[in-house]
């Protein structure tokens, strides 16, 4: 599966324990998304377009109205990255 660089960045943050908060409009559509790292920082690369692509590919999921997290399919498709901690 082809995954863009920005999608890879977001998936990597989610694989490390991050999550995506979303805001819905009155009609139920998602208006805005914020991607948080496990440390509580906001990831600037997480735009609404990237969010929609990840959700369409079923790489992220939300269970019981909770924030979006990485799915099992997303964990299998994310490439390994070095973590400079």
Swiss-Prot record:
Q: Which InterPro entries match?
A: YjhX_toxin (IPR018654)
Source organism's superkingdom? Bacteria
Residue runs in coiled coils: none
What Pfam families does the record point to?
YjhX_toxin
Q: Hey, which family's this protein in?
A: Belongs to the UPF0386 family.
The record's HAMAP family line, in alphabetical order, gives:
UPF0386
Protein name (record): UPF0386 protein Bind_1628
Organism (species): Beijerinckia indica subsp. indica (strain ATCC 9039 / DSM 1715 / NCIMB 8712)
């Amino acid at each position: 599966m082809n995954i863009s660089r920005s999608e890879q960045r977001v998936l990597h943050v989610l694989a490390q324990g991050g999550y995506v908060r979303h805001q819905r409009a009155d009609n139920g559509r998602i208006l805005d998304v914020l991607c948080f790292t496990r440390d509580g920082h906001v990831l600037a690369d997480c735009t609404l377009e990237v969010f929609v692509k990840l959700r369409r590919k079923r790489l992220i999921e939300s269970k019981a109205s909770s924030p979006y997290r990485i799915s099992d399919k997303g964990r299998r498709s994310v490439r390994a990255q070095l973590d400079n901690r």
